[in-house]
């Protein structure tokens, strides 16, 4: 999905605020995904799924760190996330349908914590960004 200059501007404007709370917001998005789509728990057999567990926060930080990298490479998301795509496709074999589920929850979390900044243009830009990330992470499945 092509990100326009305007999309990139909106992403770069809000993402540092999100990144500053990476483990918390990433964990919150994961927790929401696990609660709304329980089938996604199958990849985490030893997790404590309670909202603020060390497992949720640690994996939330991993998600946030990957999104930070993608945000820092908006012109080359595929190159920047290639190894992560390999990991999810070949080693972890994560259901590619899970990435849009998490992307949706990330949008929800950003909207909750940044209601003034989450205007329609920012919503559109972040949605396109997360779709781009999801597309990269599922590209090796084909």
From Swiss-Prot:
Residues 2-142 form the Globin domain. The keyword Transport applies. Keywords: Heme, Iron, Metal-binding, Oxygen transport, Transport. Red blood cells. One of its GO terms (molecular function) is oxygen carrier activity. Gene3D superfamilies: Globins. Heme b binds at residues 59, 88. Pfam families: Globin. The keyword Transport applies. One of its GO terms (cellular component) is hemoglobin complex. It comes from the Eukaryota. Involved in oxygen transport from the lung to the various peripheral tissues. Heterotetramer of two alpha chains and two beta chains. PANTHER family: HEMOGLOBIN FAMILY MEMBER, HEMOGLOBIN SUBUNIT ALPHA. Belongs to the globin family. This is Hemoglobin subunit alpha. It comes from Xenopus tropicalis. The gene is hba-A.
């Amino acid at each position: 999905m092509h990100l326009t200059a305007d999309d990139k501007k909106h992403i770069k404007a809000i993402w540092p605020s999100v990144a500053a709370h990476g483990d918390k917001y990433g964990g919150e998005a994961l927790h929401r995904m696990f609660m709304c789509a329980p089938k996604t728990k199958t990849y985490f057999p030893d997790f404590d799924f309670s909202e603020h567990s060390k497992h949720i926060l640690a994996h939330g930080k991993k998600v946030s760190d990957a999104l930070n990298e993608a945000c820092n490479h908006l012109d080359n998301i595929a190159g920047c996330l290639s190894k992560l795509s390999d990991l999810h496709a070949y080693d972890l074999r994560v259901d590619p349908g899970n990435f849009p589920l998490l992307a949706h929850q990330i949008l929800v979390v950003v909207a909750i914590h940044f209601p003034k900044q989450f205007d329609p243009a920012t919503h559109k830009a972040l949605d396109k960004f997360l779709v781009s990330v999801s597309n990269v992470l599922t590209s090796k499945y084909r």
